[in-house]
From Swiss-Prot:
Native source species: Saccharomyces cerevisiae (strain ATCC 204508 / S288c) (Baker's yeast)
Family: Belongs to the mitochondrion-specific ribosomal protein mS41 family.
A molecular function GO annotation: structural constituent of ribosome
Transit peptide: 1-27
Transmembrane spans: none
The protein, known as: Small ribosomal subunit protein mS41
Key words, A-Z: Mitochondrion, Ribonucleoprotein, Ribosomal protein, Transit peptide
Chief site of localization: mitochondrion
A GO BP entry: mitochondrial translation
Length: 130
């Protein structure tokens, strides 16, 4: 037997679980219109750089594909993880009216990362003294 205090909440639980999935409505109203600077998918991919313009055939030059596809779909299309994350970040920025521009890849230091830099520098100097 179901206690009386839970029984009045049970139909609400059923009603919410049987509702249409939220994923279907996820990006329906958040697809921005193309601007003068970014009129189509090809221009968007050229503007963000990092050789993303090679993927214009993947998006089929369709503005809706660019803003509706998630990481799972891009993975199925064969886009590598670094470009997927980068494109989705730039799409998110454009959707939120933030400026989009190319973010250059970082360059590794000759002496390694920040944590071990002192050790590598000391080792390199010791080798060069001899």
């Amino acid at each position: 037997m179901i206690p009386s205090r839970i029984s009045h909440k049970f139909p609400l639980f059923l009603r919410s679980s049987l509702a249409a999935p939220k994923a279907a409505y996820r990006f329906s109203s958040t697809i921005p219109k193309p601007s003068d600077q970014v009129p189509d998918v090809d221009a968007f991919l050229n503007k963000i750089g990092r050789n993303c313009n090679e993927l214009k055939d993947t998006f089929e030059n369709n503005w809706n594909n660019l803003f509706q596809w998630d990481s799972k779909i891009l993975k199925e299309k064969g886009v590598n993880i670094q470009q997927r994350k980068y494109i989705l970040k730039q799409v998110h920025n454009y959707r939120n009216n933030r400026p989009i521009h190319e973010i250059k890849l970082g360059k590794k230091s000759f002496f390694g990362g920040e944590r071990k830099r002192k050790a590598f520098t000391a080792k390199w100097k010791a080798e060069n003294k001899q």
